[in-house]
Amino acid sequence: MSGEMFGDEVDIKARLRAAEVMYKKFHRLISDVIKGRPPKLEIPKRTLSNTIFDPERGILVIGEEKLEREFLNVGESRRFMQTLLMASIIYQSLIENEYPTIRDLYYKGKHTIVYRDYSGRKREENTWDEQKESDSVIQDIEVYTGLFREDMLILSKEKGKVVGNMRIRSGGDVIDLSKLGHGAYAIEPTPDLIEFLDVDAEFVLVVEKDAVFQQLHRAGFWKKYKALLVTGSGQPDRATRRFVRRLHEELKLPVYIITDSDPYGWYIYSVYKVGSITLSYESERLATPKAKFLGVQMTDIFGYRGKKPYLSEAERKKFMIKATDKDIKRAKELLNYSWIGKNRRWNVEIRLFLKHLVKLEIEAIASKGLKFFAYQYIPEKIETGDWID
């Protein structure tokens, strides 16, 4: 290592482990060159066609298909170069005691290479043009090394929040999540480095929107019902998904999720539950297969087979929003996903949506009154088991 390492013991151990794994994985390329073999990388394909739903584990997993990136293959040489460049930057950050963000890595690696082609003409090539290109390279390194970017101490913007009767240790400090006033604890980008000390909660409630999270927080929902209240502020980041998984897996707390009643809200639930297609290689640690969809359900709005709707006809007219062509297309896509389309309850929900072609935001339920939302709608659905599994 270069220089004396700093940080708490947990960080130092993570740094040492990641640096060792990266060194061993990429040192193989040097061995190939020494032995006269063209260096190449074999990386699992991160595509929809190589994403499989494992019904036994209830999560999306990456398949066995791999792609080869060879240095001497003209079609693959640029991506090969990008992968080695990014790996070297990450490794250097590890041994230099740095905590780069994904944006930092983009800028550190972005430059123009000037060279001459076979005919002697001068050429210029950027290492990468946009951040989404460098982000994709980081994901390739994750699947190649088996390390996640959090393991490599790569930071990202904090997005998720949590509040509740729980104490944790982070960076050597003990934090009481019940004593943050009207604020909440921002879930750090390296949630595996958080130590759970003690908790007094009976379940986890994840709400899609930050505004709804704040309403429930100020209403004292988590105090009254002994809950840990979490939000991913829309599409959840990896840290929030991992934190929720840990709460369920390590503390054995049931997880309930509330999103808008539309195809995009349903997909957010799916991401928490089974994982995402783009990050299927991370589902084992990010997904929470037993997470339950509490609402807002289409059957909450229209009723179904004896279930009474929570909204009157007048309230439906007031709060319902007409579905867009994009919403309709997304709903049909969801039905094609086996983990949704083969689920009887989800078939009912989505076909009700396609029948009425309307959607509802969480705030519409809350508009009946915060007390109704916090003290009747949510607890009633939990008590009666009115969720989709």
Curated annotation (Swiss-Prot):
Instruction: Give me the reactions it catalyses.
Output: ATP-dependent breakage, passage and rejoining of double-stranded DNA
Named cofactor requirement(s): Mg(2+)
Q: Name one GO biological process term.
A: DNA topological change
Q: Does the keyword Nucleotide-binding apply?
A: yes
InterPro entries recorded: Spo11/TopoVI_A, Spo11/TopoVI_A_N, Spo11/TopoVI_A_sf, Topo_VI_alpha, TopoVI_A, TOPRIM_Topo6A/Spo11, WH-like_DNA-bd_sf
Outline the extent of the Topo IIA-type catalytic domain: 13-161
Q: Does the keyword Isomerase apply?
A: yes
Q: Which domain of life is it from?
A: Archaea
Binding-site positions, Mg(2+): E208, D260
| Protein family according to the UniProt entry | Belongs to the TOP6A family.
Its recorded name reads Type 2 DNA topoisomerase 6 subunit A
